[in-house]
C-alpha cells in the first residue's frame, strides 16, 4: 500500500512538473518579439540614409540596439518593471515614426505605475496590432496608449485611427493573458473614426 502511494505521489509530481513545463513553453511561444520584417525595414532604411543623412542613420541604429538589447536580455525574465517595458514601447514607436513620419503617438500614465512588475513585452502586441495595418494608409494616423492604476487594477487602452477588422489577431494576446492572470478583461471597441482595445488586469497583492 505504501509503495502504491509513493508511485501515485511520484506520478502526481511528474504530471504537475510536465504541466508547468508545457505552460512555460506555451508562454514563451506567445511572448511577442519584434518582428523580423520590422527589423529588416529599419536596416533597409538605415542603409538608404547612410550616405545622405548619417546622423539619422546613427539615431536609427542606436534605437534599434536598445530594442534588441531588451528583447535578448530583459525579456527572458518572468517579470520586469513597468517602466522598462514602457521604455521598450517608446523606443519601438520612435523607430516606427522614423520609418513612417505619418505616425503620431502619445503615452499617458496615471497612478503609481512605474514600479509595477509586469510580464515582459506585455503591451507591444497591441501596438503591432495597429502598426502593421497602417502600412496601407497614406495619411496621418495616431496611436494613443493610456495606463492607469486604480483600486488594485491596471487599466490599459490602446486607441488608433487605423481601422482594423481582423479581431482574430487578439487570440494570442487573450491566450497569454489566460496563462498569466487569474482575472482580466479584454475588449475591442470599433467606432466610425477610432478603434480601441481596453484591457483590465487585477494586480496580485
What are the language-model segments listed below?
Residues 1-188, 196:
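Two-component histidine phosphotransfer core
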Residues 195-205:
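Short C-terminal beta-strand
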